[in-house]
């Protein structure tokens, strides 16, 4: 892939969306993971200024992720704010009857998105998305949480392609080497949740997207079954609510 042209196209897209909305800039959640780090880097290239990052750890968030996010803010000279959301999460735990790890992870994602939209209004800026194509196809995210945004410059790149672009843009090796994780609970791992590496997942997704029967026959049947199941079960996450026409 021509990463120079792709980078230019993404930067043009960011500039266009901000200009057409008459916004001042963008707001993003910076987790310390590779996706948000890549988007922050693209935003800085595109806009030069008015890129505001919110770092929103919980008590169990990986400290290394916060350190990496802070280093990136320093490297890019980003305006940022740290908001620890544990007290908000604790209030939910006291009131809720559903406190499974998944439920708490989803609620934490929605807390973060609420804060992002609050700051987007405060700064007259757009919330920019950080989900990649692999996550979007699988519905691997929280509806009205990390999936919510005004626009998304990286949603057409598979996770494996995110790594390639990150290397091209010389992101710090910490982002490239760390295991992918939404950091929703302690020691949470995307690939452990999904049961396969992103390399295999992306291979399967591409085969399904192009309906490459020859390639599909060579892939692990359990991988293809998992992908089809998640894509079908979570398809609603990528759609606007249906409205009855009278």
Curated annotation (Swiss-Prot):
Gene3D superfamilies, A to Z: HUPs
Subunit structure: Homodimer.
GO molecular function: ATP binding; glutaminase activity; metal ion binding; NAD+ synthase (glutamine-hydrolyzing) activity; NAD+ synthase activity
Pfam family of the protein (one): NAD_synthase
SUPFAM superfamilies: Adenine nucleotide alpha hydrolases-like (SSF52402)
Annotated binding of ATP, by residue: 29-36, 130, 159, 181
Domain of life assignment: Bacteria
Cellular component, GO annotation: cytoplasm
PANTHER family: GLUTAMINE-DEPENDENT NAD(+) SYNTHETASE, NH 3 /GLUTAMINE-DEPENDENT NAD + SYNTHETASE
Binding residue positions for Mg(2+): 35, 135
GO terms, biological process: NAD biosynthetic process
Biological or metabolic pathway of the protein: Cofactor biosynthesis; NAD(+) biosynthesis; NAD(+) from deamido-NAD(+) (ammonia route): step 1/1
Binding-site list for deamido-NAD(+): 110
Keywords tagged on the record: ATP-binding, Ligase, Magnesium, Metal-binding, NAD, Nucleotide-binding
Listed EC numbers: 6.3.1.5
Record-stated family: Belongs to the NAD synthetase family.
Function description: Catalyzes the ATP-dependent amidation of deamido-NAD to form NAD. Uses ammonia as a nitrogen source.
Protein name, per record: NH(3)-dependent NAD(+) synthetase
Signal sequence range: none
Reactions that this protein is recorded to catalyse: deamido-NAD(+) + NH4(+) + ATP = AMP + diphosphate + NAD(+) + H(+)
Source organism of this protein record: Campylobacter jejuni subsp. jejuni serotype O:2 (strain ATCC 700819 / NCTC 11168)
């Amino acid at each position: 892939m021509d990463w120079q042209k792709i980078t230019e196209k993404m930067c043009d897209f960011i500039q266009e969306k901000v200009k057409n909305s008459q916004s001042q800039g963008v707001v993003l959640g910076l987790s310390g993971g590779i996706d948000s780090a890549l988007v922050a880097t693209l935003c800085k290239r595109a806009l030069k200024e008015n890129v505001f990052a919110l770092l929103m750890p919980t008590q169990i968030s990986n400290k290394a992720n916060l350190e990496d996010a802070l280093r990136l803010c320093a490297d890019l000279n980003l305006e940022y704010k740290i908001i620890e959301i544990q007290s908000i999460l604790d209030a939910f735990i006291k009131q809720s009857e559903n406190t499974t790890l998944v439920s708490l992870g989803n609620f934490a994602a929605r807390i973060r998105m609420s804060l992002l939209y609050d700051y987007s209004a405060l700064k007259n800026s757009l919330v920019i998305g950080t989900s990649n194509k692999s996550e979007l196809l699988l519905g691997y995210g929280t509806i009205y949480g990390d999936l919510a945004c005004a626009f998304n410059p990286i949603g057409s790149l598979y996770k494996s392609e995110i790594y390639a672009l990150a290397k091209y843009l010389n992101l710090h090796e910490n982002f490239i080497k760390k295991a992918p994780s939404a950091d929703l609970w302690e020691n949470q791992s995307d690939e452990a949740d999904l049961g396969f590496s992103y390399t295999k997942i992306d291979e399967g997704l591409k085969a399904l997207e192009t309906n490459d029967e020859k390639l599909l026959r060579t892939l692990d049947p359990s991988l293809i079954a998992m992908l089809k199941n998640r894509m079908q079960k979570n398809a609603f996450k990528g759609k606007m609510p249906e409205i009855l026409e009278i």
